Amino acid sequence: MKAQELRNKNVEELNAELINLLGEQFKLRMQAATGQLQQTHQLKQVRRSIAQVKTVLTEKAGE
């Protein structure tokens, strides 16, 4: 998701997105630990998405 799309969301939607991404990250990490993860780039994508959401939440907290 692009940063501008994230900035258009409200705080509740961003928190829901963050919880969703953290759950997805957990699933991917478990798959990687058991050797079932085929597309390892997904871990990086999810980690960056989490960082983007947290950044936008911090920006909104400062407003």
From Swiss-Prot:
Keywords: Ribonucleoprotein, Ribosomal protein. One of its GO terms (biological process) is translation. Transmembrane segments: none annotated. One of its GO terms (cellular component) is cytosolic large ribosomal subunit. GO terms for molecular function: structural constituent of ribosome. Belongs to the universal ribosomal protein uL29 family. This is Large ribosomal subunit protein uL29. It comes from Actinobacillus pleuropneumoniae serotype 5b (strain L20). The lineage of its organism: Bacteria, Pseudomonadati, Pseudomonadota, Gammaproteobacteria, Pasteurellales.
